[in-house]
Amino acid sequence: MSRFFHAKEDSDSDTSSSEDEVEDQKVNKSAKFRDDLDFMAGPEEDEKRVVRAQKDKKFDELKGIIKQNRDAKSNKDLNRLLTGFDSLAKAYDKSKTVFQRQNVANPRFYIRSLVEIEDYVNKLWDDKDAKSALSKNNAKALPPLRQKLKKYIKDQQLQDLVTDYRVNPDEDGYETPEDEDDDDFGEVSESKAEKSPGKPSEKAAVSDSDSDSDDDDSSNWSSEPESNSSDDEDSVTKMEQLRRYFLKKEFRVESKDDKKEKKKRVIRVKEAVEEDDDADWTPVNREKSVVHFDPKEEVTHDVMIKKLNEVMSARGKRTTDRNQHVANLRKLLEVSEEKELGLGINVKISFCIISALFELNAKISDHMEYETFMTTLQTVNSLLDLLIGTDRVKLSVTYAEEDENLKDDTQEYRIQGSILIAVQRLDGELAKILQNADCHSNDYIEKLKAEKDMCSLIEKAEKYVELRNDSGIFDKHEVCKVYMMRIEHAYYKYQDQNEEDAGKLMDYLCNKIYTLDDEKRLRQRAMLCHVYYLAVHDKWHRARDLLLMSHMQAIVDHSDVDTQILYNRTICQLGLCAFRHGFIREAHQGLSEIQNTQRAKELLAQAVGTRQHEKTAEQEKIDRSRQVPYHMHINVELMECVYLICSMLLEIPHMASCEFEMRRRMLSRSFHYQLKQSEKASLTGPPENTREHVVAASKAMLNGDWKKCQDYIVNDKMNQKVWNLFHNAETVKGMVVRRIQEESLRTYLLTYSTVYATVSLKKLADLFELSKKDVHSIISKMIIQEELSATLDEPTDCLIMHRVEPSRLQMLALNLSDKLQTLAENNEQILEPRTGRGGYQGPGSWFPGRNERQGDKQKGSGGYQGERRGGQGQDGKRGNWGSQGGQQRRHPQKPRAF
C-alpha cells in the first residue's frame, strides 16, 4: 500500500481519536456536575430541614471551648488551660450582643465552667505538694491564670452569679436548658446519620446506570442525541434539588411531650448501656475470716488453746486484717467466758487482745487513734481489775511458753506477759496523741481528758504492784517505771488544795525510786522531777539544796536527751521560783543559761529547731517525738520577761557605777542588745510587748525616775501577759515594786554622786517612798562594798560625799587627753621607720647597697636592715628601728577611750 493511503488512514485515526476525547470530556463534565449536586441532595426529599439560630451557634462555640478546657484540666496542662480561658472570654464577649438582642441571660453552663476552673485553680494553688510537682511551664502559667480568672469575674460583674451557683450547684447528670437544646440537635443529626446509610446504595445504582449508559453511548453512535437529552434532564433535576435545598423553611416546633419522650429515650439508652457494662463484671465480696468451732465437737481447753494458736499464727502477716484479727480474739474470749473455761484462758486471750490493739498501727512511730486508745485503756483496765480481784493468776515476763498453766485449776495459773509494760506503752501512746493534736483546738481538750483515766489506771497498776510485790513476778525496773509514770503525771501540776498530802506523796514516790532503782537514769529523772515540783510550790531552799546535792550540773552533759530536756525545764522553773521569792541574782543566773542561747523553745522541747537543713528526716522525726505536750509547756514569754526584769535590776546600777570605765563588764549581753536596739530607733513609740516595756522601764530607772519605771512594769497590759500568770500575783508585784525603789535609789546615788556634796536621808526617803531605816541600810551596804565614796553623818542624818572620783568635766578632759596621746603615738610609729642615724639622708638611705660596702651589708650594719616594720633583715635578724646599736624608747600604750 502506498504512502498516500497510509497517511489518510493515520489522519482518519487521528480525527476519530480526537472526537472520542471530546465525547469523553462531555461525559466527564456532566458526571462531575452530578457529583457536585449530590452532596446537597438529602436522603429524603420530604424531610424537613432545621435552620439553627445564631444563639445556638454561639452556644456551640462556647461549649466547644469549654470541652477543650476540661480536657486541659484532666491532662493538667495549665498552658493550654490558660489559652483556652482567654479564648473562652473572647468568645463570650463576642456573643454578648447576640444574647442581649435575643434577651438571653448569661448561660448557666458558662457560669458552671468558670466555677469549675476557679475551684481547680484554687485547689491546685493550696496544695503545696501538687504545686511542687508541676512542670516549669505549668508552674509559670498557674499565677497568671489565677489572677486573670479573679479579675475577669470581677470586671464582668459575675460574682453574684458565681455565688448563686455555688449555693445551688448542678447535680451530677443535671442538664441546663441550653444543654437540652444541644442534645435535641444531636438527636436530629443522629437520625440523619441513621438514614444516610441508604444513600450510598442509591448513588451506586445511579453510577451503575450511568456506566451502562456510557457503555451504550460509546457503542451506538445513533443514540448520541438521546444521551444528550437525558443529561439535560438530569441537570434540570439537580437544579430543582438545589433550589429546594436553599429554600428557607419554618422552624420545627416541638411540644413538651416530644421533649419528655426524647429525655425518656435517652435515659433508656443509658440504662441499657449500663446494664451491658454491668453484665461484664462480677461482684466479689471479701469474705471475713470468722472463728468457727465444729458444732459436733465440745469446746474444751485444748480445743480453745489450739484455736487461739491458730488465730495468733496469722499475727504480723501482710495479708492479715488487723481489725478482723482483734474481732477474732474477742470472739474467742466470748466463747471462753460462755463455756467457763477458767481464768487462765480468759487472761491469756485478754492479753492477746491488748497486744493486737497496740499492733493496729503499721508503724510504731505513728500515734494511735483516739478511739482505739480508749478501747485499749478499757481493756487494760478490765484486765487489771481481774488480776487485782484474784491471787490465783500470775502474769509475768519471767515465765516461758512451756511453763504456762492455762487449764489446771488446781494450781496457780501462770501466763507469760506483763501488764505493767502494757500500761507503760499506753502512757506513751497518750503522749503521742497529745503531741499530734492541734493544741489550740477543742479536740486537744477532749483528748486531754483521757489523762485523768490514764492516771487512775497508773494508780491501779501501783496498787497491783504493792499487792503482788511479794510473789516475785515483777522486775525492779518495771516497778520503778510504774512509780516514775505517776511522778511524771504529777510533778508539773500546782496543787492549791491538799498541798501537804501531795508533797508527801511526791516524797514517797521519789524515795521509792531512790531505793529500788539500780540504774542512774530513773534516779536522775526522779530527782529532777522532785526539784521541779518543789520549785512550782515555792519551796526554794529545799529545791536548791536538793539540786546542788545531786550534782546534776556536772553529769547532765553525759545523760540522754530526754533527761537534758527535763534538766532545762527544772532550771527554768527554779529560776522563776527564785524570782517569786525575791532572789534576783539567783533567778538571773538560772534563767540566763536558757535565755542567752536564743533557742529557749528548742532547749525546752516546746518547738522544733529552725535549722532543719542540718538535720535528716529521721533526726527531725526523733526531735518531734521528744516534744513536750502543750499542757506541760513553760511560758517562754513569761520567762523572758522575768529574765529581762532581773537583768534590769542588776545591770542598771552596774552601768551607773561604771559609767566612765572604758571596758566595763556586762552581766547580760542580751539585755544590752535590747537597749542598743531601742537607742538606734529614730522614733520610739509607746511600748507594746513585754520586752519593750522592760526596756522603757530601764531607761527610766537609769534617770532615777522610779515611778515611771514602776508604771512601765506594773500596768494592765503587763498584768494580763505576766503578773496574772503567777499564783501569788500581788505578792510578786509588791516585791518587784520594792526592788525597783531600792535599785533606783542606788542608781540615783551612783549617777549624781559628783553633783552633791551632802544629801539628806529624809529627802531620799521621801523621794523614793522608802522608810528612813531602809535608806540607811542601802547606803551603808553601798559604802561597805566600796560602791559609794561617802560618809553617813548620824547627828545631821546626812550623807557626805567624798570628792574621790573626778567630776564629769574632769572625766571628759581625761578621756580627751588619752585620745590625743594615743593619736600622737600612732603618728610616731608611722614616722619612725623613715629616720636614719643622722636624720634624713636622702633617697640613698632606702638602698643601703649603693652607699655601703658589701661586707657591711653582710655584717648587718646600717641604719635600716630588712623591712620597715621590723621584719626579717638581710642577715636573717630583725631590722633596727633606730641607729646602730641604739635602743628606741617605747611608751606603753594606754587603753583607748573608744
UniProtKB/Swiss-Prot annotation:
Biased composition regions of type Basic residues, renumbered to the chain: 888-898
Low complexity: compositionally biased ranges: 219-228
Gene3D superfamilies given in the database record: 1.25.40.570
Compartments it resides in: Cytoplasm
Domain of life: Eukaryota
InterPro entries listed in its UniProt record: EIF3C (IPR027516), EIF3C_N_dom (IPR008905), PCI_dom (IPR000717), WH_DNA-bd_sf (IPR036390)
Official protein name in the record: Eukaryotic translation initiation factor 3 subunit C
Organism: Caenorhabditis elegans
